[in-house]
Regions:
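Basic, flexible Lys/Arg- and Gly-enriched helix-loop patches that mediate nucleic-acid binding at interfaces
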Residues: 14-254
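Methionine residue identity
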Residues: 1-2
Length: 254
């Protein structure tokens, strides 16, 4: 059976119109949401003209992002990358000391599913399949992400209860979902999130008077960092068996 990614590519090459943000995602540049941001920032051109929201493209169009031509690929890969502390999750940032793309040094254009802030480390799943990235980032799907956290105060029963039951974050005007939290040490705990609010764990801890000393993502959906002998800054291409389950859990045919 032809997978959905190959189907998109085939239809596109047969001259079927595709929405620009979807096309950018299918080329592995970024998610659709990030593609909209690129368009808004004027970093996308079609046939030499600055792109606008809502336009469609076909295989006869030349699409460039940041001056580089992009094209869809039939070969879709997923990699597990150990992001080190100090590396910034962004495609391009002139102020960043080092971005994930620069640190990764992969020979295909890939993007990530779910940011880790500069001061955090751990597992990033990266792919050139924008449809997979988009599906993995959908909050409504409640995909699990697990973290090891160390704070500068004792982890009490009240702390665990507040973290797990959900809390209102004033600065985001959002309430966190109830989640699983397990104490692992006097000042450490593991937490499993099913949403990805900006700096969520750090904000939750701060609301309870604790500062995060160390934050490490150890699992994304069915992919566990401990299953791979990865050092910070290193990556591994995931096996077909692991990727197949990842697509299934993300709700994408493969």
């Amino acid at each position: 059976m032809m997978n959905i990614c190959s189907t998109f590519t085939l239809l596109f090459r047969l001259g079927i119109f595709m929405r620009l943000n979807k096309y950018i995602a299918s080329c592995g540049v970024c998610s659709r949401r990030e593609a909209d941001k690129l368009i808004d920032e004027g970093r996308v051109t079609i046939n030499g003209e600055k792109a606008v929201f809502g336009v469609d493209v076909t295989d006869t169009d030349s699409v460039f992002v940041d001056g580089k031509k992009i094209e869809p690929s039939d070969e879709k890969i997923v990699i597990a990358y150990y992001k080190p502390v100090g590396v910034t999750c962004t495609e391009k940032d002139k102020y960043a000391e080092k971005t994930v793309i620069e640190d990764l040094g992969f020979d295909k254009r890939v993007t990530y599913a779910g940011r880790l802030d500069k001061d955090s480390e751990g597992l990033l799943l990266m792919s050139n399949d924008g449809e997979l990235i988009n599906a993995m980032m959908k909050g409504s799907m409640k995909h699990e992400k697990e973290y090891e956290v160390t704070v500068d105060t004792d982890v009490t029963g009240d702390f665990l209860k507040a973290m797990s039951s959900g809390m209102y974050l004033k600065e985001l005007d959002r309430r966190t979902r109830a989640c699983e939290v397990k104490k692992t040490g006097k000042r450490s705990f593991n937490i499993i999130l099913t949403q990805g609010l900006n700096r969520q764990i750090r904000r939750m801890c701060a609301a309870l008077g604790a500062n995060v000393v160390k934050l490490k993502r150890i699992r994304v959906m069915n992919v566990k960092l401990k299953d791979y002998d990865l050092k910070p800054g290193k990556y591994v291409v995931l096996s077909e068996q692991v990727v197949k389950k990842l697509y299934k859990d993300a709700g994408i045919a493969r």
